Amino acid sequence: MGLKNKIIKIYELNEEERKKVLEFLKKEILNGKIVICGTDTLYGISANALNEKAVRKVYNIKRREFNKPLSICVRDKNEIEKYAYVNDLAKKIIDKFLPGPLTIILKKKPGIPDIVAKDYIGIRIPDEPIIRELSIVPLTTTSANISGKESPTTVDEIDKEVLKKVDYVIDIGKCKYSKPSTIIKIEDDKIISIREGVIPIQKLARC
């Protein structure tokens, strides 16, 4: 498939066309295809996180070391408890800040393969309807770049090498926040700051 044919300007389609395209892409994701899609923060590489072969492809495309965990994107708050343990503090944060530009790292339940993450798993619910619609299974969510390079906020900023190796690219225009998500880890009743992004850590600490 040529580069032009794999890039889908999703918001230029009418509602009926968009629905058809998204249904097609959901089937393709279930079949192990790799998709780049814009989120509220950055463009990310998404694959079925339950499919180890597809996840391995994501690592290879990014040239990322396999000992570095990936985060996942889920469709809604109810999905989080399928894949991670949620205590009262985590629930408060989830209810207040998700969907939104936050990655919350929680103790992982069995189900997500260890190639994605071992003991703890980072989980996102982006404030962007297209990626949530595609999340009929948990999707990998990792920036659409070669590891260590700049993270893209538009399709034009994505490395050509990365574009060539994925199956589809969903162009949503410029990402809403255009900077990385804030990352926190919940251990017992403590919030551990991993990376400050869109949401200030102090705001989260008030929970």
Swiss-Prot record:
Catalytic reaction equation(s): L-threonine + hydrogencarbonate + ATP = L-threonylcarbamoyladenylate + diphosphate + H2O
MF terms (GO), sorted A to Z: ATP binding; double-stranded RNA binding; L-threonylcarbamoyladenylate synthase; nucleotidyltransferase activity; tRNA binding
Predominant subcellular localization, coarse grouping: cytoplasm
Cited function: Required for the formation of a threonylcarbamoyl group on adenosine at position 37 (t(6)A37) in tRNAs that read codons beginning with adenine. Catalyzes the conversion of L-threonine, HCO(3)(-)/CO(2) and ATP to give threonylcarbamoyl-AMP (TC-AMP) as the acyladenylate intermediate, with the release of diphosphate.
Family membership noted in the UniProt record: Belongs to the SUA5 family.
Domain (YrdC-like): residue spans on this chain: 15-199
Pfam name, any one: Sua5_yciO_yrdC
Cellular component terms (Gene Ontology): cytoplasm
Keyword Methyltransferase included in the entry's annotation: no
InterPro entries in UniProt: DHBP_synth_RibB-like_a/b_dom, Sua5-like_dom, TC-AMP_synthase_SUA5
Localization annotation: Cytoplasm
Name of the protein: Putative threonylcarbamoyl-AMP synthase
Lineage of the organism: Archaea, Methanobacteriati, Methanobacteriota, Methanomada group, Methanococci
Keywords assigned by UniProt, alphabetized: ATP-binding, Cytoplasm, Nucleotide-binding, Nucleotidyltransferase, Transferase, tRNA processing
Taxonomic source organism: Methanocaldococcus jannaschii (strain ATCC 43067 / DSM 2661 / JAL-1 / JCM 10045 / NBRC 100440)
GO biological process, one term: regulation of translational fidelity
Known EC number: 2.7.7.87
Keyword ATP-binding: yes
